[in-house]
Amino acid sequence: MMDVSSMYGNHPHHHHPHANAYDGYSTTTASAANASSYFAPQQHQPHLQLQQQQQHQHLQQPQQHLTYNGYESSSPGNYYPQQQAQLTPPPTSSHQVVQQHQQQQQAQQQQLYPHSHLFSPSAAEYGITTSTTTGNPGTPLHPSSHSPADSYYESDSVHSYYATAAVATVAPPSNSSPITAANASATSNTQQQQQQAAIISSENGMMYTNLDCMYPTAQAQAPVHGYAGQIEEKYAAVLHASYAPGMVLEDQDPMMQQATQSQMWHHQQHLAGSYALDAMDSLGMHAHMHHGLPHGHLGNLANNPHQQQPQVQQQQQQPHQQPQHPQNQSPAAHQQHHQNSVSPNGGMNRQQRGGVISPGSSTSSSTSASNGAHPASTQSKSPNHSSSIPTYKWMQLKRNVPKPQAPSYLPAPKLPASGIASMHDYQMNGQLDMCRGGGGGGSGVGNGPVGVGGNGSPGIGGVLSVQNSLIMANSAAAAGSAHPNGMGVGLGSGSGLSSCSLSSNTNNSGRTNFTNKQLTELEKEFHFNRYLTRARRIEIANTLQLNETQVKIWFQNRRMKQKKRVKEGLIPADILTQHSTSVISEKPPQQQQPQPPELQLKSQGSDLGGNELATGAPSTPTTAMTLTAPTSKQS
């Protein structure tokens, strides 16, 4: 760190980081106590304090992680311009308020000072506790952290790295982050940082490369913890999609550091409600992130680091998060935590601050804006945070649903084109009407999906309906309601048929138009059984995607037609008897064994053949059927 501080010109502060630089930031313990008060002032006096703090942080973060400071410093110049927001976010947890301000100010400062590495602030903001955690919260960390972190961070490549691999870079800062909150865990963090420092120092060049290369790995882990914010900080635009990887990168090497950082971030976040609030204030999103991401993930991150690195304060502050991150306490878990907090330049801060100031290039504005915008973004981007932020997961689900459904829907339009043109036309064009006409339940459900299916454009609502309809269609009882969904979705399976059948079967006039497939199956069944048991009727209705009532009425009409034909002498009377007998005798076996399969396969084959073939087996439920359907249908 000495080198780093001298490198960054912060070494004067760097030497007295505990006492001077970090009142709340400098000494982890003090930072824990002072974090909120210090950060609040920092927030208010961001530039001077941020500069001082950042310098102090740099000084201290030379302790805590000069690595990070170097990192941050390096990255700020390079990275900050690109990822000022990202840099700013790093101080999410304990520095969040202060660091967010610091980072924001750092972003400004770094704007002021191209070489943010000169200020540890970025490092500090990034939770550049790497150094600190590595050594004592004080200077000891600087050297060990400093060498690895220093080299690691000193390199302007770090800038690039941060810009590119800010996440990885952040890892070392993760311990830096603990500067404030992690100083309690500074020793652990320091130790981790020392480990990290060695790793970083050895990987100084590598870190940039490895971390970048490792991003995918980190990404995997990071997403779990919603490190998207971290990486997003760094890779806001670049890694926004692949935020996690950067985190892993950090994690792998600086994973402990990251853990520390997350400790720090979490610690400070949780340490001082004011931090969270301040951070929130500074980053409109901190509270939100803290809420959704930070609490769950930052807390976890911080927690894990806390647990790993005995940060009583952080642990106390983040007890609820500790349970979550004990798993993270393992190196891998730590990595995840690190990913969260450190990911990109303190991705954790990002997340905590802005969730992910992922896009946010400028930490301060991006952090606030990104925090506001990215909390959802981060959470949504990090499905892992979905637990913390149900909205995200659910948002993603929504997004995902349409995509899968969209294919189904798109195929639905194809369905009309397929062999069952009439039915599918109904489905596509008349599905809404059909659905309306179809079952009452089906009509309600069907209308939404049908609209979607009919339009051929999957609406989210339509998609959701479709999914529901798929489920319903799959359910025998839901034949009516399923059909609408099936219609909308154009589910290849019975669902689609049911909706098609319902739609096809139900004209605006109220008359049901049966598809050839449906008629074939009904005739086949009628051939064996003129009278259906209710169970069989339900089975057939489900298979053909019809309502029980439709099947019942069809059989009634068919029997009347048969009787009429016999009466007219068109059909031998014995046929009726044979029919009856055969039906009676065969009814149980065929209904139970051959017919159901046949009906299902054929009916589905027909309907699916029509629907599904048209759909191209887009629907999941129909996939199996689709294979069958194409075979039966096409064959």
Curated annotation (Swiss-Prot):
Keyword DNA-binding applies: yes
Recorded GO CC terms: nucleus
Gene3D superfamilies recorded: Homeodomain-like
Sorted UniProt keywords: Developmental protein, DNA-binding, Homeobox, Nucleus, Transcription, Transcription regulation
SMART domains: HOX (SM00389)
Comp. bias intervals (Polar residues): 341-352, 376-389
Subcellular location field: Nucleus
Covalent S-S links between cysteines: none
Family stated for the protein in its record: Belongs to the Antp homeobox family. Labial subfamily.
Name recorded for this polypeptide: Homeotic protein labial
Name of the gene this protein is made from: lab
